[in-house]
């Protein structure tokens, strides 16, 4: 049985245009719909405006970093938002322990540079 990814929407929170565009293209090739946030200030606004199935969260985004955004998502009153899988993306994974990621509410994480096969595998693991 194949999973219909066309009904799945992924929010990509990333300030690097190069990484944002590559990630978007890879996921669009898998038939996911994409919503974008270029900084931490846009993340909750996008989540409240558009239902999504998963968040790819750059940890080092401007305005509010990814850890703060993740905490705010987890504290949100709406279970459709606060229960979302959040996959952290970071080039500084060594700066954080898995305990810190878990404490913030991160579901999983991927290191940069992104391995796009791993990206697709992890997204499918959480949203199909």
What are these regions (language model features)?
Residues 39, 65-72:
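Acidic catalytic/metal-coordinating carboxylates
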Residues 14:
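Conserved acidic carboxylate
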Residues 51-56, 61:
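Active-site beta3 strand of CheY-like receiver
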Residues 62-65, 94, 113:
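The feature encodes the CheY-like receiver
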Residues 21-29:
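Charged docking surfaces used in two-component/phosphorelay signaling
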Residues 31-38, 45-46, 110:
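Short hydrophobic/Thr-rich beta-strand motif most characteristic of the beta2 strand and flanking loop
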Residues 114-123:
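C-terminal output helix
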């Amino acid at each position: 049985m194949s999973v219909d990814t066309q009904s799945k929407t992924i929010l990509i929170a990333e300030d690097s245009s190069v990484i944002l565009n590559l990630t978007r293209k890879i996921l669009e090739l898998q038939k996911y719909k994409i919503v974008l946030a270029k900084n931490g200030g846009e993340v909750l606004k996008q989540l409240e405006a558009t239902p999504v199935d998963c968040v790819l969260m750059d940890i080092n985004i401007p305005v509010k970093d990814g850890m703060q955004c993740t905490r705010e998502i987890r504290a949100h009153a709406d279970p459709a938002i606060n229960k979302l899988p959040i996959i952290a993306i970071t080039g500084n994974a060594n700066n954080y322990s898995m305990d810190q990621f878990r404490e913030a509410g991160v579901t999983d994480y991927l290191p940069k540079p992104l391995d796009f096969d791993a990206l697709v595998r992890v997204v499918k693991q959480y949203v199909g």
